[in-house]
Design a protein with these regions (language model features):
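N-terminal accessory beta-strand-rich subdomains and adjacent acidic, glycine-rich linkers
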Residues: 10-165
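Bacterial Sec-dependent N-terminal signal peptides
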Residues: 1-10
Length: 165
């Protein structure tokens, strides 16, 4: 368990162009930021989930219990699609966070690819977090400018839709 007041760690993408910074502030709230080629593209942004009927929620009071880093690199051939090969190359860090007051754990897993960042919340099996309902997600994406975003429309049965900006 961490006994320091705050915690911070950095992870770089395989080509070192993206740099993720993760930290817990003085009250144990998780934050992240992202730099690309030394320029900040996602400013310090809060992570957390508010639970229904839970005064503490999964917002703060965390300590870093464990940090696990790994790298992965594979090329695979899809059965169908526009590309004949898919490169899956990333560096990963998983932070196991503990709320000592509630004896609960979550894992925040980040993957840094040469093309960008992905992350998710994981809920390991535990006695004090068996059944819960997320009331509100407080994950922030503090963009540093008026960036263009691309996405695929959801809830469609086909992969043949244009990207939207």
């Amino acid at each position: 368990m961490s006994s320091i007041l705050s915690y911070g760690q950095t992870l770089k993408s395989p080509n070192s162009e993206h740099e993720l910074n993760f930290k817990l502030n003085e009250v144990g709230t998780p934050f992240y930021s992202l730099h690309y080629k030394g320029k900040e593209v996602i400013k310090e942004s809060q992570l957390g989930l508010e639970l229904v009927d839970d005064e503490t929620s999964l917002m703060n009071g965390f300590e870093v219990k464990e940090v696990s880093e790994t790298s992965f690199n594979e090329v695979w051939e899809p059965v169908w699609g526009e590309q004949s090969e898919i490169i899956n190359h990333y560096n990963e860090v998983a932070f196991t966070l503990e709320q000592p007051e509630m004896n609960r754990h979550i894992i925040i897993r980040f993957r840094l690819f040469d093309e960008g960042l992905g992350f998710r919340y994981e809920f390991p099996q535990q006695e004090n977090l068996v059944y819960f309902v997320i009331k509100e997600e407080h994950t922030e994406f503090g963009m540093t400018g008026d960036h263009t975003a691309y996405w695929i429309p959801g809830d469609y049965d086909s992969q043949e839709y244009d990207y939207t900006t």
